Amino acid sequence: MKVTIAGDYCPRERVAIAIERGDYSMIFGEVKEITCESDYSIVNLECPVVETPSQKINKCGPSLKCTGKGVSALKWAGFDCVTLANNHFLDYGETGVTQTLASCHSNGLDTVGGGINIEKASKTLFKTINGNRLAIINCCEHEFSIADENHAGSNPLNVTNQYYAIIEAKKKSDYAVVIVHGGVEHFWLPTNRMIETYRFFIEVGADAVVNHHQHCFSGYEIYKNKPIFYGLGNFSFDGIGSGDRWSSGYIVTLNFSGTEVEFDLIPYKQCNADNIGISLLQRDEQKLFKNIIQEYNNIISDPTRNKTEYLLWCDKTMGPYQSVINPLYLSLIHISEPTRLLSIS
């Protein structure tokens, strides 16, 4: 059984223009062959579908949205499922949530990780594919999109809840994949806490863990013979001028057979200045990609070095945030050093 997983998809700016005129092949032409060769293909829908006037929720950061054509494009590209546990799913409130679910289902796409309440949002997706039973668990870190008993939104990352979800999934399936939307935006390594959490998911039965959210790709590791991918990067997310890290990513294909999980990484560029489509890397570019991934993997395997890289990144990026944080809070941060603003274990 071959399962393909892609990262963050948000049809905006130039991509939105192409999709609204129905030029899906310009964006996904090189990807469709990959999805068509897979038994099941999954992508993260990083924005709600909003077809009617809707009020934005109060939050920090941009409010993202697309039309139903953004979902139709995914179906054309060969995807079977979208993950909805992310920090933008609730950007336009419950109206956006219900319209997103309706658009996905009318296009024949499965959904996981989001719903009209926490019961629906936290539900594991089960699929029978070529005689194999696959379970997909999707969750995200807490920001502005989390569902509860009475409100729509995304399934939150909660280690206790995911523990029970994995245990239950393994009773009902042959393979369980956990897809998490988390990490530090624009930082190309996982925190040590992420590593600890995702390894725990493997320990309790997950056959693979896949992460996205950071807007840049990260490395991976094999833990107890199971793969953990710490960041796929943007799949299609226009942001011209944002740099190579923003425009680089990879698709992962998981091949399940017996107790083995083999995988392939398919690197690409997306939304460059001269090409808004997803373009697979050429041979010389793939060599550079492999070198970068190997360096990330080396750092991930060394907790001390990984934490050092994280703290260095915090020091370099703290400046822009200091101007928007309450000065009194900053004084408390200084008093509490060396925990830093974004602490990790």
Regions found by a protein language model. Name each.
Residues 53-75, 175-207:
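Active-site-proximal segments of metal-dependent phosphoesterases and phosphodiesterases across multiple
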Residues 333-345:
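Single conserved hydrophobic/aromatic residue that forms the stacking wall/gate
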Residues 12-14, 49-52, 87-101, 118-123, ...:
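Active-site environment of divalent metal-dependent phosphoester hydrolases
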Residues 1-85, 93:
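N-terminal catalytic scaffold of extracellular/periplasmic and nuclease hydrolases
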Residues 14-29, 64, 128-176, 196, ...:
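Binuclear metal-dependent hydrolase catalytic cores centered on His/Asp/Glu-rich metal-binding motifs
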Residues 122-136, 227-296:
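Binuclear metal-dependent phosphoesterase catalytic core
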Residues 78-81, 191-251:
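Conserved beta-sheet core of the metallophosphoesterase superfamily
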Residues 38-50, 86-87, 169-189:
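Short acidic, glycine-rich surface-loop motifs adjacent to enzyme active sites
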